[in-house]
Amino acid sequence: MAAGDFRLCDVVLDDTIGRSTPDVEHERAVAIFDLIEENSFAPIGHAGGPYRLNISLADSKLVFAITTEDGGNVATHILSLTPFRRIVKDYFMICESYYEAIRSATPSRIEAIDMGRRGIHNEGSQTLKDRLTGKIEIDFDTARRLFTLVCVLYWRG
């Protein structure tokens, strides 16, 4: 473990919830790949990683279980899903519209839906970043990728 190495080296989603649609699973795979490639993840009060993150749902709560690369316990943070419910619901609705649009809509229609989708995704990302304040310091791009994974878990659950 290198002191000050504040990044994720592995991210795992709760597999007990099951799989989702191919589109959602693709989003999950891309988000995890991008997250591992580039992220900023600093649990408050810890000397440094890299870290492994297990994201799960338990009793309608979002659970972030963090360990070091070699498995040493760092922290577990449990967040209420309530602040995310409306955002995730809106995000799923617009994603369904987006996936339908890419099959048959005009490029301008697809672009308009995609702009709305990105806006809602940004709102969810900022909400997640805010909810982790004082627990884990992350940058906005890391928050975006983590929010995608929260949505995947929510969709499965």
Curated annotation (Swiss-Prot):
Domain of life, per lineage: Bacteria
NCBIfam families: PRK02853.1 (NF002769)
Listed HAMAP family: UPF0262
Family: Belongs to the UPF0262 family.
Name of the protein in question: UPF0262 protein RHECIAT_CH0000657
